[in-house]
């Protein structure tokens, strides 16, 4: 018994020793939480350019030097969906496969995702950010949402940020980060736009930014091969081995502050290697056979800091080879370029209140085939309402509808009986679904 008591006392003393700084120098290095900043870094769809978000927060003195910040985000939700076609649910906030959604009705009450982040700055020029993600609903692992392969942790983002906008208009980052391509943000409280699913890239690389005179120019050198999302170039003799830094994207946008209550942003981007470069049959992360660039242009307006309006269009430069199925009867449809469009608006009634209420509406689409083809298009409509609590956590409800069912894997069919019969595809331009999702994101 005495041995147990001694051990407990030693543990308590050790805990007090490691948690209490012994010198004034050690007191300068603090560990803490900043829910408002953590929300901006961990929310999944309002502003996905996290390198720029962190730099802007540093510029606004919201992240002091020599402080390590811990952040967490938990998104839980319940939803119900109904489809007019058996086992074809096109809502993309979970992978649309029959492994997880069967029949013509689906419902769930689940954890959508959990994030844990560490970020901080060692001085006025150097900062770092790392985010660990658990997301069985949207994992690329095989099986159902309870399978081991879909219940894994991953370092979703991680980068070192170099720069000080107070002293110099250039800053950069190296690591795993979102590609600065287009407007991948959404006005929805939870759901990402179809534009995001189609063109929002995530990969290893090095980024350089210029920000001054209301101009923001960004260039990113991206590791080649098939990256984590929406980025792919041919490496060597048609492999996807990421052994060369041979992909890049560039973005330029300009913000026009007409008055203190109205600003307008316009921008355009170019991507050297989009993911739409594979031959038939298409499968995630397979090697490409060409480099297929993409371009985008976008705009957004902010009125009275209450009304936000966005619009964007993106398209590949070349046809996607894999959208041509050589087997009849589907061989009547030629290979097609890929494009996406998004338009939306949201209005916040009381942005300065402890609970800010927002209503939103958004349309986005994905065009991957010629008129009449089963993989022609997938449309998404969202109506949303949310309450943002202390600028750090929110509850939300969305009503959504989809038209078309166009998964990327085997979008135009497969080799005979691998897994589909010859001349068939699981894509459908007639499939449609309706649903409602309610949930909460709690951030510390």
Question: Model features per residue range: what roles?
Answer:
Residues 1-10:
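Bacterial N-terminal signal peptides that target proteins for export
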Residues 94-97, 125, 131, 135-142, ...:
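Flexible, solvent-exposed coil segments and beta strand-coil junctions
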Residues 26-45, 83, 100-103, 147-148, ...:
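Outer-membrane beta-barrel pore domains
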Residues 61-84, 103-227, 249, 253-260, ...:
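Outer membrane beta-barrel
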Residues 9-18:
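Bacterial N-terminal signal peptides
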Residues 20-89:
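N-terminal periplasmic/intermembrane-space "pro-region" immediately following the signal or transit peptide
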Residues 110-113, 153-157, 201-205, 245-249, ...:
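Transmembrane beta-barrel architecture of outer-membrane proteins
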Residues 226-281, 290:
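Loop-centered beta-sheet repeat module
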